[in-house]
């Protein structure tokens, strides 16, 4: 498991990469779960997002299943801040932003490719 720390004006964000094995998915035996969390003492138990991607040894990490990453970062007045999405864009991830949830407190975006070595 690898952890990357991102400092933002709204706190410290952690991007955690975990390997997993899904026996029910023989076509995808070595997926990675990408979990984003914010280290914020006001929300110590919040998990901010999970996306499963396929590991391709030739092309890197690819989302071949259409899974979506759901990321929330708390800012002023509890609003969500796209700091992690900006960091993912810088890392080379293909990120679509701007799709707000019905409650107006978040964004859902597809993660097509993620290059953690560039963070």
Tell what function each PLM region has:
Residues 1-42:
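OB-fold ssDNA-binding interfaces and closely related basic DNA-contact patches used
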Residues 3-6, 15, 68-71, 95-96, ...:
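Hydrophobic transmembrane signal anchors and adjacent membrane-proximal interface regions, especially
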Residues 5, 11, 23, 49, ...:
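Compositionally biased, intrinsically disordered low-complexity regions enriched in proline and serine
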Residues 13, 51, 62, 100, ...:
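Compositionally biased, intrinsically disordered low-complexity regions
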Residues 34-36, 53, 112:
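Generic structural hydrophobic/aromatic packing signal, biased to beta-strands
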Residues 38-88, 92:
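Acidic, aromatic-enriched beta-alpha/helix-loop junctions
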Residues 75-119:
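Short, compact, well-ordered microdomains
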């Amino acid at each position: 498991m690898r952890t990357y720390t991102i400092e933002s004006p709204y706190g410290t964000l952690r991007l955690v990469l975990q390997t997993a094995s899904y026996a029910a998915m023989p076509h995808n035996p070595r997926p990675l779960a990408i979990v984003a969390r914010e280290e914020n003492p006001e929300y110590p138990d919040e998990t901010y997002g999970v996306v499963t991607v396929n590991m391709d040894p030739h092309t890197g990490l690819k989302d071949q299943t259409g899974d979506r990453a759901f990321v929330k970062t708390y800012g002023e007045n509890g609003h969500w801040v796209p700091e992690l999405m900006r960091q993912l864009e810088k890392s080379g991830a293909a990120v679509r932003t701007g799709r707000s949830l019905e409650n107006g407190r978040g964004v859902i975006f597809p993660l097509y490719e993620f290059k953690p070595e560039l963070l």
